[in-house]
Amino acid sequence: MSDTYLVAASGLAVCFFVLYLLRPKTALPPGPPKLPLIGNLHQLGKKPMYERCQEWHRQFGKLISLKLGFDNVVVIGSSQIARDLLDKKGAMYSSRPKFVMAHENVTKGFHTATLPYGPRWRLHNRMQLSVLNKRIVTRCRQVQEFESLQLIHELLFTNDFHPRFQRWANSLQTGLGYGQRLAKGDECNIHEMEHISRVFREIFATGTWLVDLFPALNHLPPLLAPWKGVAEQHYNRTIELFQLNTAAALSKTSWNWTKKIRSLTESQGLPPDEVNFLVGVMAEAGGDTTGVVLDMFTLAAALHPEKMAIAQKEIDTVVGTDRLPNFGDVDKLPYLAALIKECLRWHPAAPFGLPHSVMQDDTYDGYHIPAGTTIIASQWSINFDPETFPNPYEFRPERYLENPDLPISSFGFGRRACPGRYFAMDSLFISISRVLWTFNIRPIKQGKDDPPMPAWEFVMDGALLRPAPFKALFSARDIHRQRFVIKEWAAAEKSVDVEALYDAIEPAGGDFSAQEKEEPVLVA
């Protein structure tokens, strides 16, 4: 009797196993064939991941699926799909995958960008928006005008543009974040900030760390997990700088992000180092990406002087030759606005952005997207989608005048979009408008056998994409403009009280004008 029962039970188990094997497979989006255990990892080493995914989008469609280790990954290759999923279904698609190296090891769970969607992230977001809402950003414009004046003055005397762009961007961020300008660009602070930026770029690069692909490895003892020691060194160095900057900021008499955020009731319940991180990564991220975009602008200017000439003619018509462009000119310079958008599209600084994670099962266009799937909106594939951007490899600002509704993916999507995007666009407007007012930009060639400008040669710097090294000549458009900039900077350097500019951003007691007392429009 027992033998009969055993045979029957075994037969039933075999039936269930066969039915399991024959079950309908989950209808994930199409993608390249996968190997057991590693999935598609073996296909990612020969080319940058953004290029490989663009090839797969051409082969399999605008929505593709990959397997990286044990993780399902869905990569989006069109702005419409990105809006449908990340914008319209933001409540479902706003979390983050498990960043073991970045979130758990290097930043101890303090980095806003790696937090899963939930109450803690919303708290971080509210604190960030207290200094990045449109009302505050508008009142930062005097600081941006002052810093941009120093930038164009420096470029009159050097063609080494990258350090000048980086100083300008970092000085804006540390000035507002901590009340500490970087007037020279060789301050100890800037070198430490650049080191930390480099670390963050590396830890956020998709597929860099084996422990992110196989999280169980993080349970190994430190002797067998050398990345833990690396992470601890990075964390200690980062938090030491953030603590020093915070102490300096709190000692300032002028307004800054640190003092504002520390004054919020919401910050009182958080560990002090978590608040230090919140401000620190705001200062770090903005300086890093803005500098890269200005490098990309310089490349575009050297390669396409005819497009810059159109923008210069527009600026000259509106501004004239006896003053610099200012924020009062924004609405009068549509071609310049289109040129800035095209710079962001043509060479995206972060071709993959930061991945999202879907929090519950979803279906899109007949495909099943399981909960926990990593979602990547590939800015590279989106920006070079010929259905949205005809002749996508052509640098053509006119496309944004012909269709003002063309998307801009540079700042991300949905609820995890960059909260500093309004400030970033203001920074790009004032710097690029003043550079074009002052200079013609041309390539520098040492000899006839020198290679051409690297229009499509890039260097992956962690999660950021930089143009391959190149040289450019910044020459004043005429002697009048050169003398004007020198005179204006001499006067500003002597008379402008920068701390007073910081204090004017949010007067004591919140004494804004009647117009500014209206509810500010916050970043989504």
From Swiss-Prot:
Which keywords fit this entry according to its UniProt record? Heme, Iron, Membrane, Metal-binding, Monooxygenase, Oxidoreductase, Transmembrane, Transmembrane helix
Oxidoreductase: present as a keyword of the record?
yes
Q: Which Pfam families match?
A: p450
Gene Ontology cellular component list: membrane
A single BP term in Gene Ontology = terpenoid biosynthetic process
Phenotype upon loss of function: Abolishes the production of all the drimane sesquiterpene.
Q: Where does heme bind?
A: C418
Q: Where do the TM regions start and end? A: 2-22
- Extra remark: The various drimane-type sesquiterpene esters produced by the A.calidoustus drt cluster include asperiene C, asperiene A, (6-Strobilactone-B) ester of (E,E)-6-carbonyl-7-hydroxy-2,4-octadienoic acid, ustusolate A, ustusolate C, ustusolide E, ustusoic acid A, (2'E,4'E)-6-(1'-carboxyhexa-2',4',-diene)-9-hydroxy-drim-7-ene-11,12-olide, RES-1149-2, as well as the 3 newly identified compounds calidoustene A, calidoustene B and calidoustene C.
Q: So what family is this one in?
A: Belongs to the cytochrome P450 family.
Return the protein name: Cytochrome P450 monooxygenase drtD
